[in-house]
């Protein structure tokens, strides 16, 4: 995903003319040094662009206006090097439409004990200048992120990078187009939702596209392109005998390749970043898209089965956040339980559509019977997720607000092989335990579909919820049901009073 390379975070340093030209030059020099060092050595995912020092209301306001209109700018990072009276910032902060981060740092790490004088004190005032700025953020009720620490510290770099990833995901969501091939699975509740409110809140453009329109594109894929993709499959995966050249189900693999190429063309040509399918609307398709959905997810597209556009959008968001990080992200469903005493586990899977970015080993490519959908045997990749930390995330519509529910997981290795299971899977212990996790998930109303990720963490998801202005509920090792119930009740009152 090349998105990050095209984006910028603007760095605006606050000061004022009270201190004179010499001090302002030092402020500008320090800001330039910090910018260049962060860009070169901090491993940040997005380039920082330094703007002129903000010393007046008009200067600061102009930069905020420019940030709003510049499509490369995903957010504004501010630092109060000296004291910068916050009334100068009111128009800028009131009109800013991009994520805001206050970097509460200072140029020097240590106090120059034997040399410190009032010139030094007047130059390095972030300790109280940052508090002045913080008051205005609170007064304006601004969603914002604060990172505290020296600009050379790795922990500060990590937090800056996390915020940049969230800002990039928000930037992407503001322009996200989601193609719904078919409608929601009939009579299912949680996959429904208010698409207008979703566009107001997140920017999601969710629209229906007839499967017949997609079929026309799939049917027009050249045979030479299909053969080239089959060669890629053979190089990337371990093919079962049935789908190898001359195998009894080679035609199913051929059709899956045609589907992938056609679906990718439809999505790319239409500027879509996410899509949904449904097994109840496959008119003109020879098989339920399985392999195509798996591989399109791996290429960065969001996906939701059975018309689940909210999960498709959230998956795309996490794909953007996790760009370049270790671990993968996939559509997922809590499918079935292992209820052995002292070793409760959840087996996550879906009919076909689990992203190979979470595969522990080289996937196996096969085609097998699938009764749901009543079509030909679909191709699919088979694999298991690696052991390690993970998160499940679910975005739901509660009528008066969206709620993002996340559950901390510990993925474990399969204790035994599952040779008859024809789908990819992940096996995990939910935190703090299955009983508490499942009860909390159900009380919070989270969906049976989720986004499973081993690259994005709870901190990033919390920041996303904060900046998007949506409710956030976390289930982790500290969760206790009585406290969770209280939190849900308090949240209900808060959102009715304040939104």
From Swiss-Prot:
An example of a GO molecular function for this protein is:
L-arabinose isomerase activity
How and how many cofactors are bound, per the record note?
Binds 1 Mn(2+) ion per subunit.
The record's listing under Pfam families reads: AraA_central, AraA_N, Arabinose_Iso_C
Q: Which EC number(s) does the record attach to this protein?
A: 5.3.1.4
Q: Which GO terms describe its biological process?
A: L-arabinose catabolic process to xylulose 5-phosphate
Pathway given for this chain reads: Carbohydrate degradation; L-arabinose degradation via L-ribulose; D-xylulose 5-phosphate from L-arabinose (bacterial route): step 1/3
What this protein needs as a cofactor is: Mn(2+)
Give the GO cellular component terms, alphabetically: cytosol
- Reactions mediated catalytically: beta-L-arabinopyranose = L-ribulose
Q: Which UniProt keywords apply?
A: Arabinose catabolism, Carbohydrate metabolism, Isomerase, Manganese, Metal-binding
For the ligand (Mn(2+)), the binding residues are 306, 333, 350, 449
**Family that this chain belongs to:** Belongs to the arabinose isomerase family.
The protein's role, per its UniProt record: Catalyzes the conversion of L-arabinose to L-ribulose.
**Alphabetized NCBIfam families for the sequence:** PRK02929.1
**What name is this protein filed under?**
L-arabinose isomerase
Specify the species: Aeromonas hydrophila subsp. hydrophila (strain ATCC 7966 / DSM 30187 / BCRC 13018 / CCUG 14551 / JCM 1027 / KCTC 2358 / NCIMB 9240 / NCTC 8049)
């Amino acid at each position: 995903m090349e998105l990050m390379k095209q984006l910028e975070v603007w760095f605006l340093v606050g000061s004022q003319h009270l201190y004179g030209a010499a001090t302002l030059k030092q402020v500008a020099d320090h800001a330039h040094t910090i910018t260049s060092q962060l860009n070169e050595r901090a491993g940040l995912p997005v380039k920082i662009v330094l703007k002129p020092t903000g010393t007046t209301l008009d200067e600061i306001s102009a930069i905020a206006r420019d940030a709003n209109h510049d499509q490369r700018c995903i957010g504004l990072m501010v630092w109060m090097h000296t004291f910068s009276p916050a009334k100068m910032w009111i128009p800028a902060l009131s009109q800013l439409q991009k994520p805001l981060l206050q970097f509460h740092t200072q140029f020097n790490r240590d106090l120059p004990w034997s040399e410190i004088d009032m010139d030094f004190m007047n130059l390095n005032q972030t300790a109280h200048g940052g508090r002045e700025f913080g008051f205005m953020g609170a007064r304006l009720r601004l969603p914002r992120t604060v990172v505290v620490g020296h600009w050379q510290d790795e922990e500060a770099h990590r937090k800056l990078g996390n915020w940049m990833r969230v800002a990039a995901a928000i930037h992407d969501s503001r322009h996200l187009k989601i193609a719904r091939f078919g409608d929601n699975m009939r009579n299912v509740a949680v996959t429904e939702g208010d698409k207008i409110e979703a566009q107001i809140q997140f920017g999601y453009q969710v629209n229906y596209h007839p499967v017949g329109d997609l079929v026309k594109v799939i049917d027009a894929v050249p045979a030479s392109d299909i053969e080239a993709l089959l060669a890629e499959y053979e190089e990337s995966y371990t093919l079962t005998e049935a789908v190898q050249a001359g195998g009894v189900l080679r035609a199913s693999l051929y059709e899956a390749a045609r589907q992938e190429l056609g679906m990718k063309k439809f999505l790319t040509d239409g500027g879509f970043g996410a899509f949904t399918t449904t097994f109840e609307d496959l008119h003109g398709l020879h098989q339920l898209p399985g392999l195509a959905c798996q591989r399109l997810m791996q290429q960065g597209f969001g996906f939701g089965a059975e018309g689940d556009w909210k999960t498709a959008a959230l998956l795309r968001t996490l794909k953007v956040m996790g760009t370049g990080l270790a671990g993968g992200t996939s559509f997922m469903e809590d499918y079935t339980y292992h209820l052995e005493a002292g070793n409760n586990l959840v087996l996550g899977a879906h009919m076909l559509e689990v992203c190979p970015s979470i595969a522990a080993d080289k996937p196996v490519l096969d085609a097998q019977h699938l009764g749901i959908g009543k079509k030909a045997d679909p191709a699919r990749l088979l694999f298991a997720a690696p052991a390690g930390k993970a998160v499940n995330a679910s975005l739901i519509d509660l009528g008066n607000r969206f709620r993002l529910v996340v559950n901390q997981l510990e993925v474990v290795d399969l204790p035994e092989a599952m040779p008859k299971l024809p789908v990819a899977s992940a096996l995990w212990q939910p935190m703090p335990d299955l009983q508490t996790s499942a009860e909390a998930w159900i009380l919070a109303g989270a969906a049976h579909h989720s986004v499973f990720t081993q690259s994005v963490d709870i901190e990033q998801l919390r920041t996303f919820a904060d900046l998007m202005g949506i409710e956030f509920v976390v289930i982790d090792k500290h969760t206790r049901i009585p406290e969770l119930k209280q939190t849900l009740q308090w949240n209900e009152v808060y959102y009715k009073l304040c939104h």
